[in-house]
Amino acid sequence: MQELKGIGASAGIAIAKAYRLEEPDLTVEKKNISDSEAEVSRFDEAIARSKEELEKIKEHALKELGQDKADIFSAHLLVLSDPELLNPVKEKISTDSVNAEFALKETSSMFVTMFESMDNEYMKERAADIRDVTKRVTGHLLGVEIPNPSMISEEVIIVAEDLTPSDTAQLNREFVKGFTTDIGGRTSHSAIMARSLEIPAVVGTKAATGTIQNGVTVIVDGINGDVIIDPSAETVKEYEEKHNAYLAQKAEWAKLVNEPTVSKDGHHVELAANIGTPDDVKGVLENGGEAVGLYRTEFLYMGRDQLPTEDEQFDAYKTVLERMEGKSVVVRTLDIGGDKELPYLQLPKEMNPFLGYRAIRLCLEEQEIFRTQLRALLRASTYGNLKIMFPMIATVNEFKEAKAILLEEKEKLVKAGQAVSDDIEVGMMVEIPSTAVIADQFAKEVDFFSIGTNDLIQYTMAADRMNERVSYLYQPYNPAILRLITLVIEAAHKEGKWVGMCGEMAGDEIAIPILLGLGLDEFSMSATSILPARTQISKLSKQEAESFKEKILSMSTTEEVVAFVKETFK
Amino acid sequence: MQELKGIGASAGIAIAKAYRLEEPDLTVEKKNISDSEAEVSRFDEAIARSKEELEKIKEHALKELGQDKADIFSAHLLVLSDPELLNPVKEKISTDSVNAEFALKETSSMFVTMFESMDNEYMKERAADIRDVTKRVTGHLLGVEIPNPSMISEEVIIVAEDLTPSDTAQLNREFVKGFTTDIGGRTSHSAIMARSLEIPAVVGTKAATGTIQNGVTVIVDGINGDVIIDPSAETVKEYEEKHNAYLAQKAEWAKLVNEPTVSKDGHHVELAANIGTPDDVKGVLENGGEAVGLYRTEFLYMGRDQLPTEDEQFDAYKTVLERMEGKSVVVRTLDIGGDKELPYLQLPKEMNPFLGYRAIRLCLEEQEIFRTQLRALLRASTYGNLKIMFPMIATVNEFKEAKAILLEEKEKLVKAGQAVSDDIEVGMMVEIPSTAVIADQFAKEVDFFSIGTNDLIQYTMAADRMNERVSYLYQPYNPAILRLITLVIEAAHKEGKWVGMCGEMAGDEIAIPILLGLGLDEFSMSATSILPARTQISKLSKQEAESFKEKILSMSTTEEVVAFVKETFK
């Protein structure tokens, strides 16, 4: 028996035989060719057959996984008809009189390196697409069979270095019980697909393909990120029980889909979801989300080479508001800069982007971008229950200035006969420490706060949460963070305003009892965390949690808080 | 009459005729030469004559400005005998058979670009030295007279693009009443020299040489950074009065050199100085400093290619402690990373260095560097009144761990028979917001706090203080900052501990009344700010300042606080 540690990318436990998805040997040698015309048509032939295959996979994905997953293969089909990729390959074949495999390899690796060097998640995913498409076309050129997971006809756990989008799209849930890969993380394609398919998955093990042989029994625990190879009968039994317990828990969660979130002693809080695109609303409703607590609008601006138009934005906001059917939607205005770059804005390189010219700072300076977004929101406001919040506010004057611009645009629209809702709540993110310290001053100006704990923790501890060397300082349970959260909640309630939280902490099982006791009104998290959180809260007493408030706030370290919460709220 | 705006680099007002320090025309053309041997000896000849001149300037600087200013010319003399510069020039003359001027120009500009590309203040100064030396040698090669400010024999104000170290070293205070340059800032050579010579100076005007003609009357106001060209009689009179008022004020300040710092109602606080090298102690004592509130030890590590030895550090700490003659010296342990890089440590490039692996984070990880510094400090402790503080502490555990390492090293030294003082106070910098928010927890562990407001403001407002685009958020008077400072002072005093401040805010005339009212015990600032601060405090009543505490802390913006303080403490 052997154990591997990886990243739990999709919850659940699977036990089955290992099926190694062998990377086909696609080693390409440079060969000189005489008839380049014949070689170019051989290349075209391979492109055509790849397109055929992708059309079939896209169909399968649409049926099994829904539109946005199928869209990935539309992107692949676009790559296959992109002259920017194909022409240089053909030119290379003719000018250098080299074989098509080599010309393709050279051209595509140039694109992959370029995209991967861009410090931007979206462009890295484009690199994965190009690598995936190149593999498929090269397979046809070399006459090498590309493994086709959809052909699997017995219960298996897939073992691979990484799963390309087309691999994961072909996974047939009936037989593929789970998978484990060497590389990848929670946000890579394979992980996102596993969660949609609800197939347990552990990624980033670094050693799956090196250790697991074909046919050997494997256990994949996607909750804790463990992979057990050739387990003893006893271990298999233990994990079967865990699997059943997980299924029971999932069933328990499912019962609460349409229930409100109420503590044991009758206190109601709102569980909302964080979303990035209109397509995410489906997941919110399926998981019993009572609202959207954070709509990150920057996705509308990313992965393109110019700003989205007012109408494009209007359509997106309108769709989300309509799909949420009157449930509240809190939209965060543009938060780019920091680690979210928009190449087409050509913002200057900064030594410390997280402490730089981003979000509301940029919007108050380059107002046309800001006003376009606000107009689109105001126009969409009549299609649902819209709330607007500004990110990265540091001073009271910044909030006042941003709100004044909103009201100015509203006035212009109303004058021009445009219908605009009259009860749009306007609030702000509390993610900069100064706003928590004098929350009483901000509470007079806002309709609500939403605490962005990811950044609030980062600035309060002066530690970049993306920097592994200082990640030990990213401490959500540090008493300093809990005291700042308390300041914000008390200040808001004193002015009759509500407080939500949209950082990862809001869905964290250790934080939830504390936050309930501190009086948080709304918890906004990733959709899949909502039902577990609702179940947890239903077993907690708000009064009991509140009774521990002073004790927790007077502790001096994270370790003390965690130990106390685990002990008290077992 | 015309006005220019620049940076007030050295206080005081000067009125005199303009003396343009013309940059000699040193344009160099590439010429092919036949006899390279003769050309090399022509080059050697020019080097020799430059050395002679520099020896004379060094002597003059030693007499007029003291050792550390003279050291600059030792550095220049070193450059003139540095084979790494000279050999490539001679090789270029022989291999490319080009004239010495061209060979020198090519080689030195390569070095200048390399040094200037290093994001490090010290290396940029090295670039200025090489440019200065190259100018001198090229002058000799071209037979062009380099202007020699020491030849000036009437009262003048020097007007130049920039003043090289050798220019400023030759300034004869008897005639040179002040100067103004196009480029440079508060920390450039010329500014530092002007302050030592106490010659009024305005740098960074961008337009001095472009606007001011030789012989025209010029007023230089080094306090406000203003330059007035061809002033009316009335303006001259106005500035003469300002000049006399400034001299009177300086005389008033001078009376308090050896006086304690006491408010109008008898409350004593300690005014200390921030220093970077042992040579700075002279300025501390000359300006009536009661202690060193911050000894930045990173200068010992910079501008070299390996770590300083334990003995090198011991010598530096011992010298400072001895020169301070029993007055307290608060030494900050190593604070590198962020904008202070040590190339020889090869630390990984970080996306946000100010939120990264720096200071105590690095020292707790790479303990040998930390332990070496602590041993040097402990050994020096018997030579004066040493206090030690750790920078960039974020959690209580970090402080406990750092203090445990100090006590471990102390135990080892004592066991080995080394004398170590028994009353070394151990404290910490409060510059990370978390430590201010739960200052009551830290106050149980430390002997004192020193509030590092430069970084505290930066993290609390999430705005990089070196980034011009967000500099408006660097707000020392923001009520959030003042409330954090209050938390720290109240927490410390409750535990019977003292609180100092070593950010720029401590010497700021708007902040001083507020800080006095909040109960700050020690104000540590640049030496030249001490006497003005002592004078200001002597006219303030602590009780009166304290009575405004609640009012100020309940304000919502910086602007409100500044207006109130200006109005109340006129």
Curated annotation (Swiss-Prot), chains A, B:
User: A single GO BP annotation from the record?
Assistant: N-acetylglucosamine transport
Q: What does this protein do?
A: General (non sugar-specific) component of the phosphoenolpyruvate-dependent sugar phosphotransferase system (sugar PTS). This major carbohydrate active-transport system catalyzes the phosphorylation of incoming sugar substrates concomitantly with their translocation across the cell membrane. Enzyme I transfers the phosphoryl group from phosphoenolpyruvate (PEP) to the phosphoryl carrier protein (HPr).
The Swiss-Prot or TrEMBL note on domains reads:
The N-terminal domain contains the HPr binding site, the central domain the pyrophosphate/phosphate carrier histidine, and the C-terminal domain the pyruvate binding site.
Give the coiled coil ranges.
Answer: none
- Catalytic center residues: H189 (tele-phosphohistidine intermediate), C502 (proton donor)
The alphabetized UniProt keywords are:
Cytoplasm, Kinase, Magnesium, Membrane, Metal-binding, Phosphotransferase system, Sugar transport, Transferase, Transport
The record lists Mg(2+) as bound by E431, D455
Q: Which residues of the sequence carry a binding annotation for phosphoenolpyruvate?
A: R296, R332, N454, D455, R465
Q: Which family does it belong to?
A: Belongs to the PEP-utilizing enzyme family.
State where the protein is found: Cytoplasm; Membrane raft
Q: Which cofactor does it need?
A: Mg(2+)
Q: Which EC numbers does the record give?
A: 2.7.3.9
Q: How does it assemble?
A: Homodimer. Interacts with FloT.
- List the GO cellular component terms: cytoplasm; membrane raft
| Gene Ontology MF term list | kinase activity; metal ion binding; phosphoenolpyruvate-protein phosphotransferase activity
The primary site where this protein sits is cytoplasm
Judged by the first EC level, this protein's enzyme class is transferase
Q: What else is known?
A: The reaction takes place in three steps, mediated by a phosphocarrier histidine residue located on the surface of the central domain. The two first partial reactions are catalyzed at an active site located on the N-terminal domain, and the third partial reaction is catalyzed at an active site located on the C-terminal domain. For catalytic turnover, the central domain swivels from the concave surface of the N-terminal domain to that of the C-terminal domain.
The reaction(s) catalysed by this protein are: L-histidyl-[protein] + phosphoenolpyruvate = N(pros)-phospho-L-histidyl-[protein] + pyruvate
Q: Which domain of life is it from?
A: Bacteria
The name under which this protein is listed is Phosphoenolpyruvate-protein phosphotransferase
